[in-house]
Amino acid sequence: METSYFLGANTASGFLSLYDGFCRGEGDYLHIVKGGPGTGKSGFMRAISREAVRRGMDVEYVRCSGDPASLDGVYLPALHMGWCDGTAPHVAEPGIFGVDSDYVNLGTFCRTPLSSADTDRARALTAAYKEKYAQAYALLAAAKSTESALAPQELGEKEVLRAGAALCALVERLPAGESPRLRRRFAGAVSCEGVLEDRSSYELCKLVYLCEDGCALAAGALSAACEAALARGHRVILCLSPADGVTPDALILPDASAAFVRAMPLSSYEHVRRIPLDRLCGDMAAVKERRRAVRAARREGARYLSAGCETLREAKALHDELEAVYRPYMDFAALDALTAKEITRIFS
């Protein structure tokens, strides 16, 4: 079984990280991979994951929000072992070195310092791609400003509570869990490839509740359902919006093989049950007006999001150039030897 998700998000507030909860459970051991641009961090982790898949093991992939084709982390549940990119913007450090975590330094295979010309090039490219990220975050902030139209207005708090009660009732019907634990992640990303949704976690669930969200009630309802699930003893994976890093987008209950998902086109899934939250509001005239306001606000936000993604594409192109500056300085033969040695150690 292979699943993937994001632990970093490009948002209106800048980069948000959830890496502090990665591979931090009881018995887990985290290898923090260090190294500069182009030093092979993603390739190193991908080689480990390929061997795990070859051996029939479950693998969790943490995708990079800046470049979704690249890996920022890998976790092997059967071994309670993980690896993550510990460099900025998601810097990671050991909890207790040698006890629950350590370093893997791939920078040792990079012959530094750079030449004078490459030093100037690296400085210029670093400044340029960081400026692009700042521009992208400003556009995402503009997108977020439309959220005021999504907050309950005509409908009010009563409708949000009613929607929450409906989801809590569904949680109560599920078998109770035995060890409540909350994990947070992003089930998508605002990225150089556009606004992505990674549905691999939902696809593993036997039952998916799709919360139809024309009136923007699902976020509050999912928060209530999360509290109810924890109270029932469930392990809970709370998936936050990659656009703002705060709003709940989905709730996954692994023990019950169930998920509650907001505003995603899942009609092709075999086990989807639709929850029309808008119909709980009673006054359909107010509902229709609210839907129109929400659609207009989402269209406006989508324009800013699209511009933000285009700017992130420009940032990635600059970062690719930066990686190319470092590549000639890398001893990839030595890196390959380390990778092979590490794979032997892990799976021996």
Tell me the role of every PLM-derived stretch.
Residues 1-14, 23, 50-114, 121, ...:
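Conserved nucleotide-sensing/catalytic segment adjacent to the nucleotide-binding pocket
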Residues 33-34, 44, 60-63, 96, ...:
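A cross-family "folded-core" feature that marks the main globular domain of proteins
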Residues 1-22, 160-200, 347:
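N-terminal pre-Walker A segment at the start of P-loop NTPase domains
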Residues 29, 43, 102, 206-207, ...:
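Structural beta-strand/beta-sheet cores of well-ordered domains, especially the beta-sheet scaffolds
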Residues 30-49, 193-197, 202-229:
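Glycine-rich phosphate-binding P-loop
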Residues 121-175, 293-339:
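An accessory alpha-helical subdomain
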